Amino acid sequence: MRCNIKRLFTLAIGVFAATLVIISFSKDNYEREWKQGPQSNEARAVGHQSPDLFPVGQNSLPHQPIPPSLGEKDLSDPFNFLFSSNKITLRKLYDLTKNVDFDQLRQNECKKNITLSKFWEKSEQRNVPEDDNWERFYSNIGSCSVYSDDQMIDNLLHDLNTSPIKHVHIMDGGTQVKFVFTFKNDKQAVFKPMRFGRDYESDPNHFYFSDFERHHAEIATFHLDRVLGFRRAIPTVGRVLNMTTELFEKAEKKLKKTFFFSPAKNFCFVSRCDYYCDTTHAICGLPDMKEGSVQVFLPDESAVPRKHNRSPYRRTYSKKNQVAEWQSSMNYCTDKVKTKRQYAHGRRLLDLVDIHILDYLIGNQDRHHFESFNVFNDLPSYAIHLDHGRAFGRSDFDDDDIILPLRQCCILRPSTFQTLMNFYSTPKSLTKALHESLSKDPAHPILAYKHYPAMERRLAKIMSHILECFESRGVAEVLVAEYNNPDVSDAEQNDEEQSEEHQDKKDDKKTV
């Protein structure tokens, strides 16, 4: 009996020891896997990702820094990177386009350019007030671009940055934190607060539709749109606010209730929205200073109506079905876009390519709709460049799907080609011109310098794709002032546009 007990005791000790060894071995393997972290397909595809960017599978939220304009100035060289244009690509582009009459083509891109005030004065004998910079901006909205007078825009940006705030309320309909500022002159603007510093990169495990919005992306995109000569983005400027006197004391009641002091004694708010409006994602000052972007309101739609149209290159906005038809078929533009009446004639398809060139340069995957002014009667409307808060999220990854409209449709506005070619071929690069423009913003520096080589890299890819189109389709077919598909009648174009807009109002963006 005593012998059996001793044997059982020895056996139990052995089993216990073996169990400890197994547990220790598993834990060691688990920790090793956790430290390594999963690598995304996107990161692997680039091949030059810095090992410090994503050391684990999921990023932790960084501390909220002070506004860069209030901190120490970054004296490093923003252009301390190697980049040169592909000489073979440049030579081929020059040779293929040397006989193109760009002056004539550019004249036909927008045949009648008239401002809103001139149009109403002529068509309705109606005078448009110009008592402040908001009204001057509205009255000078044109039939070819949102603005054309740079000095007028600079004056408006100054007012957006300095005008006393009268009232602050939560902007309805936004997925993330946005406020509406009403200034002393009763004019309004949209405010997006700074959540992260300039260096923060999007988590590769986040979908484009759940990524955090970045206020500085709105500022930088406005300047890039201006540098590229589009002038179809909405004027946006950086502004540093005192959260106590300029936000809390001016806030509506339901917003004011969401303010609190953090354990670090910083003043914070949560606000109300669909995503990230909770204490975990609170936005805090240091201790109560906060930077954000201020974007002028477009004129009220009751006075200046706009069309709201779904992009044919809209992503799925689904976790389950992540690949849209246009992402899997290179014939998509020919079969499904050029055959639609609203894209088969006029400037609309060229606008679509322009906006995707802009999106590709800034890394914006979140382009689901676009708007256009519906006020100039028979004059063709253009796509307004709106909603760039999720741009500039990744400097290490180029989403080449964004540029598929150019590659599939193979058409391009002559002025766009000339602008891109100029930046690609001359010493004053695209990012140098952008940096010069951004340095005028009161909240500069606006972008982390690591985005500059990313933009130059993407520009080089765009030029390569343009060359491919020239060689496969011919320059005359690619560079066009207007697109016209002879196989599609334009008789019912307006009816189809109205039908599309009506459907879009019923079918808002969803994530599944």
UniProtKB/Swiss-Prot annotation:
UniProt-annotated binding residues for ATP: 176, 192, 213, 295-298, 371, 387
Basic and acidic residues composition-biased segments: 500-512
Signal peptide: none
GO BP annotation list: protein phosphorylation
Record's GO cellular component terms: extracellular region; Golgi membrane
Entry keyword rRNA-binding: no
Keywords: ATP-binding, Disulfide bond, Glycoprotein, Golgi apparatus, Kinase, Manganese, Membrane, Metal-binding, Nucleotide-binding, Secreted, Serine/threonine-protein kinase, Signal-anchor, Transferase, Transmembrane, Transmembrane helix
Catalytic activity annotation: L-seryl-[protein] + ATP = O-phospho-L-seryl-[protein] + ADP + H(+); L-threonyl-[protein] + ATP = O-phospho-L-threonyl-[protein] + ADP + H(+)
Glycosylation sites: 113, 242
MF-aspect GO terms: ATP binding; manganese ion binding; protein serine kinase activity; protein serine/threonine kinase activity
Enzyme Commission code(s) on record: 2.7.11.1
Disordered, as annotated region: 486-512
Ranges per topology, Cytoplasmic: 1-6
CDD domains: FAM20_C
Disulphide-bonded residues: 110-144, 268-284, 273-277, 333-409, 410-469
Stated family: Belongs to the FAM20 family.
Name of the protein in question: Extracellular serine/threonine protein kinase CeFam20
Organism: Caenorhabditis elegans
Gene coding for it: famk-1
